[in-house]
Structures are given as C-alpha cells and as structure tokens.
Amino acid sequence: MNSIEFPLLDRTTQNSVISTTLNDLSNWSRLSSLWPLLYGTSCCFIEFASLIGSRFDFDRYGLVPRSSPRQADLILTAGTVTMKMAPSLVRLYEQMPEPKYVIAMGACTITGGMFSTDSYSTVRGVDKLIPVDVYLPGCPPKPEAVIDAITKLRKKISREIYEDRIRSQQGDRCFTTNHKFCLVRSTRTGNYNQGLLYQPPSTSEIPPETFFNYKGSLSSHELVN
C-alpha cells in the first residue's frame, strides 16, 4: 500500500554506489518527510485527528504536524472556507517554503458543500485560492482515505519535476500572490461580479466589504464568490 517506485535509480553499480539525478534525489528526500500544516475548520478535521492515535499511526509516513507555515511543506485544508478566511489561508500558503503541497479534504473544501447553496460568503472550492495537488472527497472522509491521499501525494512527488510544478502553479491560481481577484467565468451562475480588488498588507486591516463589490441589488443566486 505504501510502496513507492523509483524507476530512474540505477542500483547495478558496483561498490554500493547509487547513481541518480539531483531531481530524483530531492523528490526521494521530501516524500518521506512531509511536515503538514493542519488547517481545519469543520467536522472533516475531526477525522484527521484520528490519524494521530495508535490505530493508524501516521508517524510511520514521516508526517510531523507543524504549527508554523514556515516549517511546513504540506497544508491540509479540511472544512468550509469563507471569504473572510480566504486572505488568511492564502497568506499561510505564501509563507510556506517551496516546494509546497496542498490536500483538499472533504466536500466543503472542494466545492463549498451544502453551505454554499445560498451563501454569499462561502468559497466554492479552495482551488480558487491556492493550487490543490490531491482532492479527497467525502463528508467527511475516513482516516483510511486520508492515508490513501497521502500515499498518492507521495507517489506524485516521486515523479514530479520541480520546474514544471512552478510553471503550473503560476498559471492555475485564481487568487494571486499579490492578493488580487482575477476575472474568470463562474461554472455555476455566469460571470463573477467582483472587479479587481486589492487588499492591504495586513489581513487584520481588511474590511469585510472588500470582498463584496456589488452594482445595484442582486438576488441571492447571483451572489457568487
């Protein structure tokens, strides 16, 4: 279940010498020592807490939970993300050192879940804010599913090329690193109503009305994030 293949390693050399590329060596060193930053806001996070116990023992995967984003290379988002929380989540992601990874855990994180039906303040998918590497659906996902997602992420790390990853991250983000909403088409109700909105340097200084730039009165189904 937890086996990782390294097809580019040459173990046939004599005198116990392993020849490989610098990229593969870097991937191998990172996939077995992921340090997650746990960003839990709802019931999905309770399921992740079960992994800490002896039944699942996630320490065997090299996972060491960190409380500082500057010490983490994996952020695991679990639960509903609101527009008011969006700047804080993006700021945490930006403070993580490269290379960094994201696991979106649960229906509320991936699509907004049932809370986004008539809500004007719920983010309909955390991938609109930060690039997601692994989607973990469920309401909530079981601890076994979390382990499977971590295993799939490790396999992805073992095969990735760092330069390609950086290019894809720069092109797929809707909420950019300079805190600006991009004008993209909504998959639900048409075009977004927000213009290009800039935020102050400190998230504590962001007024609530920053995220809501409505022109005239809008019905509830037109309020999209």
Swiss-Prot record:
Its main location: plastid. GO terms for biological process: aerobic respiration; electron transport coupled proton transport; photosynthesis, light reaction. Keywords: 4Fe-4S, Chloroplast, Iron, Iron-sulfur, Membrane, Metal-binding, NAD, NADP, Plastid, Plastoquinone, Quinone, Thylakoid, Translocase, Transport. GO terms for cellular component: chloroplast thylakoid membrane; respiratory chain complex I. Binds 1 [4Fe-4S] cluster. It holds the Pfam family Oxidored_q6. It is a peripheral membrane protein. Its cofactor is [4Fe-4S] cluster. HAMAP family: NDH1_NuoB. NDH is composed of at least 16 different subunits, 5 of which are encoded in the nucleus. This is NAD(P)H-quinone oxidoreductase subunit K, chloroplastic. The gene is ndhK.
